[in-house]
């Protein structure tokens, strides 16, 4: 009788475990979809002004350099926000969900203030800086929340998240092509989307089963991130990637407009092409994430950077040539330039201290975006001197440095795996 009761108890426990596993599996896919949608909507603020720069330049009588500051201000604001967040360990000591929702809504308000009240470059740069600073609470916390739901398939999950971010940053170009001819209306629509994204995370997303209790504030964690050699190499790869990425995202649409205009194509075609090129990164991110979970993060990141680096060298020679040829090279560049992005973050979540994962991700992002301010500022200066034909070649050293860093990380991980096998044999 006791044996029968024991057997029934074991079967009941097994059924309960199976039910819990099914619930967790459904929960993680629900979280993936909701976070991806929220990230897409929240990060639509990033290029909301860049997409309408031609109209702003005309209205405010801005130079090319002045218009560039509207994008650069977002980068600088993001750097300031991520640095403050990392120093205070914000993503680890408070709810990442609440941080995401609060900063998405604050960023939306700063963006709306730009649309409603900005009338000159000084006010515009200040409000774009605030927008970037608040977006520092959207991207890294989103990655942390996603990591609490995924261990198996984390590369794919983070790839989906970065892909959604990429589509979000591309979306203002689509709105500009299809939406109102009034740039202020288009920017306000981006603010509305960001608020919806913040509310989605606050109301419908929960932390996953791999979440850890809130950590204690420890400013030393900022320095400890670089004591871990694996994390350090992953960060170096990320820095090479970032040297290229945002300068390409910022200035390739400008180059497409100029090249299409030189061939007599309609302006709306350049806007659609810009959306397609930047949006192609979403496909690249998801594809790279799926591959990375199968063959490894370091080789996939290396392949992506090798391809995007080749596009840096080639794209300028397509300027003012056939729009179709330029678009083909640009779409390949758009798909590969961001494909590796999530894998650097995945490496940090897997190789670093899980208790301070949010701090490590935020610091990685902060330093990477600080580097982008240099390359973004460099490209227009080169265009004035050597033209579009050669300007983007200056971005190629970034992916080259990234490939070298990833190959060194691959070598270290292989050595660590071999040592682990030897210990198990002994």
Go through each PLM region and give its residues.
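Hydrophobic core of transmembrane alpha-helices in multi-pass small-molecule transporters
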Residues: 40, 110, 122-137, 323-339
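Conserved MFS/SLC helix-loop-helix module at the cytosolic interface between two early adjacent transmembrane helices
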Residues: 82-120, 292
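Cytoplasmic helix-loop-helix junction between adjacent transmembrane helices
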Residues: 127-164
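Extracytoplasmic gate region of multi-pass secondary transporters
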Residues: 49-53, 230-282, 345, 375-376
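Flexible cytoplasmic inter-helical loops of multi-pass small-molecule transporters
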Residues: 203-227, 416-423
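Intracellular juxtamembrane helix-capping segments at the cytosolic ends
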Residues: 137-150, 339-353
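Helix-loop-helix hairpin linking two adjacent transmembrane segments in secondary transporters
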Residues: 152, 160-205
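C-terminal transmembrane helical hairpin of 12-TM major facilitator-type secondary transporters
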Residues: 295-347
């Amino acid at each position: 009788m006791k044996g029968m009761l024991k057997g029934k108890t074991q079967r009941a426990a097994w059924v309960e475990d199976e039910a819990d596993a099914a619930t967790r599996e459904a929960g993680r896919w629900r979280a993936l979809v909701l976070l991806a949608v929220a990230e897409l909507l929240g990060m639509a603020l990033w290029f909301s002004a860049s997409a309408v720069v031609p109209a702003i330049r005309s209205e405010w009588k801005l130079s090319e350099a002045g218009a560039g500051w509207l994008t650069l201000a977002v980068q600088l604001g993001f750097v300031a926000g991520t640095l403050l967040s990392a120093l205070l360990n914000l993503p680890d000591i408070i709810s990442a969900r609440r941080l995401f929702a609060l900063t998405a809504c604050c960023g939306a308000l700063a963006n709306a203030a730009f649309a409603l009240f900005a009338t000159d470059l000084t006010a515009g740069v200040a409000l774009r800086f605030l927008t970037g600073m608040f977006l520092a609470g959207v991207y890294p916390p989103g990655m942390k929340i996603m990591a609490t739901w995924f261990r198996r398939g984390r590369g794919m999950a983070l790839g989906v998240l970065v892909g959604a971010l990429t589509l979000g940053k591309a979306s203002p170009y689509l709105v500009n092509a299809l939406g109102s001819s009034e740039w202020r209306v288009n920017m306000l629509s981006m603010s509305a989307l960001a608020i919806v994204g913040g509310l989605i995370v606050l109301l419908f997303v929960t932390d996953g089963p791999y979440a850890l209790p809130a950590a204690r504030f420890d400013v030393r964690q900022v320095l400890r991130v670089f004591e871990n050699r694996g994390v350090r190499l992953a960060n170096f790869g990320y820095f090479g990637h970032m040297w290229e990425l945002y300068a390409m995202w910022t200035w390739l649409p400008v180059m497409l407009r100029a090249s299409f205009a030189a061939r007599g194509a309609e302006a709306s075609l350049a806007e659609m092409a810009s959306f397609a090129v930047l949006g192609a990164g979403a496909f690249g991110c998801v594809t790279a994430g799926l591959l990375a979970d199968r063959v490894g993060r370091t080789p996939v990141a290396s392949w992506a950077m090798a391809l995007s680096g080749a596009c840096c060298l080639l794209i300028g020679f397509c300027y003012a040539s056939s729009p179709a040829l330029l678009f083909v090279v640009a779409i390949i560049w758009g798909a590969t330039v961001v494909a590796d992005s999530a894998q650097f973050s995945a490496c940090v979540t897997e190789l670093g201290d899980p208790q301070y994962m949010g701090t490590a991700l935020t610091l990685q992002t902060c330093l990477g975006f600080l580097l982008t301010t240099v390359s973004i500022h460099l490209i227009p200066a080169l265009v004035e001197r050597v033209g579009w034909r050669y300007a983007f070649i200056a971005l190629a050293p970034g992916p080259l440095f990234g490939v070298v860093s990833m190959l060194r990380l691959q070598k270290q991980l292989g050595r660590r795996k071999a040592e682990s096998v030897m210990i198990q044999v002994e």
